[in-house]
Amino acid sequence: NVVTLSQLFRNNGYHAGRVSKIYHMGIPFEIIAGTADHDDAPSWDETVNIKAPEQKAPGKRTEWSPKDKSSQTFTGVEASTGDLEHADGMAADAAIEFLKQNKDKPFFLGCGFVRPHVPLVAPSKYFDRYDRDAMVSPEVPKGDLDDVPKIIRNYKSIDRYGVTPELHKGLLEAYYASISYMDEQVGRVLETLDELGLRENTIVIFSSDHGYLLGHHHKFQKQHLFEESTRVPFILSVPWITKSHGHASNKIAELVDLYPTLA
């Protein structure tokens, strides 16, 4: 009986579409297979699953966490193929097509870009933007974890992943390259809103499901209660509320606030 956010809009005459990862998806496996086994059918009028090579992409493959062989390993690929040969370029293409096909009707579009989720795959030109040797690991204060339980001190630690100082530089470079690749695809979608004359009548939200540790507190990835893991990027663009344009807020907000705000 739960009505999801997109379903609420759909029930009120909006055409609702999903592109790529919105509900939970096994990455990289479901991207490689082009499936979305945890999707919620009543939420959408149309869906697009992305099928991309992920770590199987041609190019220079790197391994930044030699002790970790799980699906969350820090594999990287400086891909020799272009933007549109990878998941987020494909997702941007599908989102752009959705906007073109539905520009004359009320719509709700959820577009899930997968980078910088591991594997850290991006065309090589995005790696070229960064100097690996100049990467700086997060500074961790002495005794930072002395006041937390041992199970937390050892959870997803640098030692568990086997990340050396030199490997850490490569990991950061690959992470930043993945972000730049994703950011470029977001820009393509926003440019399409402008080209179609939709920007001034469209609410745009950019956010994520969690933050990420990249050596902060001598730890990696998510599932921590440190701010770097729980805090998410959050940009809300409402063209007709002009007084807030370009302003940041220090007020506490949560992702659960989105539903009542938009409803």
Identify the residue ranges that each predicted region occupies.
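Formylglycine-dependent sulfatase
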Residues: 1-263
